């Protein structure tokens, strides 16, 4: 596994960002995944481009890693996929900038409503529902992340299970599962085998937790685990952001399949 750099406070830190430009959005053979930092990704599947939860500007906490591209530099997108409303996933500043070059925004109904309030072309979906973006078929998978109901400061409404999701993407070159922020759910252990997982391993009570990450990884023992939701926010005492790949490697079966990307670094999807 890649040597993990450390912040002065000892927090595991993402490798140095690898900036990219318009070339990452061009027609190509195959499917590539680029981590955008945080819980964001750019997926280019034979020229069809999607971003999941892009936070490219406007975040309100200090960062350990720069975004590999600014929102205003994105030449085009076929779709943006949003898993839930937290501002480290649904960046209003980023989405406003992407709106003019994006074919559409897809999210659970509640989040799509928030995006529509910004004037964005947003479509809401049921959990388990699907839609097509070019050759990519996307399906919303369940997530358990209604943490606001336990925080009077943040409970602006009764948050529902269906307000959050993951995304399962079937591409011509294999399947990608962006699990999303979620406590471990039994149904997440019974999915078809994905060819790659965008894997949150935050040891937080409203995330997968290390025990949950161990179980989820064991359910799909050969699937490459592209780590995200770690190493980018300067918050050494916040479990939501301070995951350590070296700790995860000591907990899971077949740790050699852990993929530690630098933000912006391309990774090629292959069928298992």
Residue ranges and their predicted role:
Residues 16-25, 40-85, 92-97, 147-158, ...:
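Pre-active-site segment of Zn-dependent metallo-hydrolases
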Residues 68-131, 139-147:
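Active-site HxH/HxHxD metal-binding segment of metal-dependent hydrolases
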Residues 43, 53, 84, 91, ...:
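Divalent metal-coordination and catalytic microenvironments
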Residues 36, 40, 132-193, 211:
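Catalytic core of the metallo-beta-lactamase
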């Amino acid at each position: 596994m890649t040597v993990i750099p450390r912040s002065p406070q000892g927090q595991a830190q993402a490798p140095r960002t690898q900036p990219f430009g318009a070339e990452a959005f061009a027609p190509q053979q195959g499917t590539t995944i680029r981590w955008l930092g945080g819980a964001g990704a750019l997926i280019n599947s034979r020229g069809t481009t999607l971003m999941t939860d892009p936070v490219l500007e406007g975040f309100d906490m200090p960062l350990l890693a720069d975004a590999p591209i600014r929102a205003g530099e994105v030449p085009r997108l076929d779709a943006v996929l949003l898993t839930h409303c937290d501002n480290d996933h649904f960046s209003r500043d980023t989405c406003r900038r992407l709106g003019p070059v994006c074919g559409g925004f897809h999210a659970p109904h509640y989040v799509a409503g928030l995006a529509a309030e910004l004037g964005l072309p947003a479509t809401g979906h049921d959990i388990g529902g699907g839609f097509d973006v070019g050759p990519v078929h996307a399906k919303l998978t369940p997530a358990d992340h209604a943490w606001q109901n336990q925080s009077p400061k943040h409970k602006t409404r009764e948050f529902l299970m269906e307000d959050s999701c993951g995304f399962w993407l079937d591409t011509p070159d294999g399947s990608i599962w962006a699990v999303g922020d979620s406590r471990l759910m039994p149904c997440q252990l019974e999915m078809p085998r994905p060819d790659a997982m965008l894997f949150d391993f935050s040891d937080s009570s409203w995330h997968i937790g290390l025990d949950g990450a161990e179980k989820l990884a064991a359910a799909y023992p050969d699937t490459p685990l592209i780590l995200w939701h770690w190493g980018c926010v300067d918050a050494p005492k916040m479990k939501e952001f301070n995951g350590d790949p070296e700790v995860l490697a000591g907990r899971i079966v077949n740790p050699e399949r852990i993929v530690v990307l630098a933000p912006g670094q391309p990774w090629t999807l292959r069928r298992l």
